[in-house]
Amino acid sequence: MNIAVSRSAEEPSARTQVQWSLRWENELQLADHAELADFFRNSYGPTGAFNAQPFEGNRSWAGARPELRAIGYDARGVRAHIGLLRRFIKIDGVDLLVAELGLYAVRPDLEGLGISHSMRVMYPALQQLGVPFGFGTVRPALERHLTRLVGRQGLATLMSGVRVRSTQPDVYPNLSPIRIEDVLVVVFPLERPIGEWPAGTIIDRNGPEL
């Protein structure tokens, strides 16, 4: 899961100022993509110039392209974002339909306000998609943050000790076409209980991460 987040507790004034919009990808116009691309460059840039490179021009996605986005706005424009894509993954060879979450970011000037808590706005949309599970991956260092965001509310289960194989978003002459990462897996039980998530330590995306 491409992710740029704040780690502090949310202030009530910050929460009430954001207006959320759920947008299907076909609903976005060129101006929307341009605004989102600028938002992602500013959000991911502080984490490293390489992380901001995918958003050059008007490109508003980094790897796989989302089909649904939750976008938070305030008077200054885009404030926060999370994307969603339905796809099949393999868990130790078992096919599973999931709604993958990614492109998770908060505007840099709001770091310290914890507006990332408002990403829970996506959960009702997840429940309406008819998929068994929501799925995402984050760095292990973000375990405490994700536990505060979704784990304590019972929205998701966090799993460690899992390796995820993905393709690069493009073909690079100096890189392997496959990425293998040791990550923290975030699972949202939707149509099926968490006990029906397949056991396994290898997840294959067979495509780039969201």
Curated annotation (Swiss-Prot):
InterPro entries registered for this protein in UniProt: NodA, Nodulation_prot_NodA_CS
GO cellular component, one term: cytosol
Subcellular location: Cytoplasm
Keyword Transmembrane helix: no
E.C. code: 2.3.1.-
Keywords: Acyltransferase, Cytoplasm, Nodulation, Transferase
Keyword Cytoplasm: yes
Molecular functions per Gene Ontology: acyltransferase activity
Top EC category: transferase
Entry similarity comment: Belongs to the NodA family.
UniProt function note: N-acyltransferase required for nodulation. Acts in the production of a small, heat-stable compound (Nod) that stimulates mitosis in various plant protoplasts.
Protein known as: Nodulation protein A
UniProt source species: Bradyrhizobium sp. (strain ANU 289)
